[in-house]
């Protein structure tokens, strides 16, 4: 009697069968949605459109308001909108462009002066996570641009005198 895997009673599974099964699983995981390479291409395309850091106005502050790496020491990310104290509005938004595997996200950070509402700067970045073959390993990821994020934005807006 032969099983659906092509083995008969008492025989062991041929290593070639493992290759076929793994290949079928790989093909099945790619069917029905974009691959991680396609999502990476979309991440790169979006980055080219509006990704990166844009500074519209810098603010000079006393040197004692910065740590040894030149980062503002008054930044408190857990305070959300008030993360920069009473004079500035900090906003951070995460948008899910794709929630299925592989996921695609857009991070947008901005800093406004409270007194006049002027946008001082913003950072936009995109990322992909997952899209790999199932397994015990951590999913891969890709993001761009390389230089972006909240801390980098703040070090470009707030400058030590």
Predicted regions, residues:
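A sequence-composition feature that detects small, non-aromatic residues
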Residues: 2-4, 26-31, 48, 63, ...
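Intrinsically disordered, low-complexity segments enriched in polar/charged residues with Gly/Pro
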Residues: 9, 33, 96-99
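Mature extracytoplasmic/lumenal regions of exported proteins
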Residues: 66-161
């Amino acid at each position: 009697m032969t099983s659906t895997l092509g083995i008969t009673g008492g025989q062991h599974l041929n290593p070639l069968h493992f290759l076929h099964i793994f290949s079928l699983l790989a093909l099945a995981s790619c069917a029905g949605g974009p691959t991680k390479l396609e999502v990476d291409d979309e991440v790169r395309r979006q980055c080219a459109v509006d990704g990166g850091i844009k500074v519209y106005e810098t603010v000079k502050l006393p040197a004692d308001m910065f740590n040894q790496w030149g980062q503002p020491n008054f930044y408190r990310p857990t305070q959300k909108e008030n993360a920069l104290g009473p004079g500035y509005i900090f906003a951070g938004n995460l948008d899910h462009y794709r929630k299925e595997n592989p996921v695609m996200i857009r991070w947008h950070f901005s800093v406004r002066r409270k007194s006049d509402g002027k946008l001082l700067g913003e950072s936009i970045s995109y990322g992909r996570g997952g899209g790999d073959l199932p397994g015990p390993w951590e999913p891969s990821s890709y993001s761009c641009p390389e230089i972006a994020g909240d801390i980098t934005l703040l070090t470009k807006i707030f400058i030590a005198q």
